[in-house]
Amino acid sequence: MLPKYYQNLPYNGKRIFEKFYDRSLQKYKSTQIATKLACCAVRKKYMLIDGKWQPRPDANNSDTTTSTEDSTTDTETEYSTTEDELA
């Protein structure tokens, strides 16, 4: 489930990915959409610097833990993913 590009995420980053992936898969019934939304959610909290995932300085300004159904829509437009990230 976790794309190769995201394998070395910190524990909390992996939890964010899994949570968004599972919720998006249930909602949209598409693994491609679920993966893209989960990647976007991770990138709201972490950035890759010199091959290591680091928390964003502004990571606490975005909440990835809301319980509303529409919480994934914020992540759809803010970050785009590349084909390498989804592989």
Swiss-Prot record:
This is Uncharacterized 10.1 kDa protein in LEF8-FP intergenic region. Transmembrane segments: none annotated. Residues 71-87 have a biased composition (Acidic residues). Residues 52-87 are annotated as: Disordered.
